[in-house]
Amino acid sequence: SKIRTADRTYVNHEQGSYESTDGSNDFALAGSGYFCIDTARGIRYTRNGSFSVDDEGFLTLNGMGRVQGTDGQPIRIENEDFTVDERGVISVSQDLGEDGNEAGMRQIGALRVVDFADYEQLHKEDYGMFSTNQAAEEVENP
């Protein structure tokens, strides 16, 4: 047969260009690293930062799973008015409470961003997701 097939697929893990969106829940990683998504098949990794808040208040990657925080748990957003700073720290707005705390922003967690020593061990899955058996290294300042 004269038909040739590729022995393997190459995935480019280098930084791509940024695309501006109107989505307030769309995030991009500067430099290396992957968001951690808690899926039905276990933890998966992606650079896709097009998140939303589900009916239970969790930050999700639509149809894929819940976004993990630095504590290893899915991130629960307490209300729709939240911000994420350049370090991935998530804050929610709070009203003046009975306890006398001032209204303003309160930190509730941070996006878990990890990187890997060997990108060749990342296995490409559907929708820009990756799996691996290698240990993930936490990115300190994503």
Predicted regions and their residues:
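Amphipathic, heptad-repeat alpha-helical segments used for oligomerization and assembly
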Residues: A136-P142
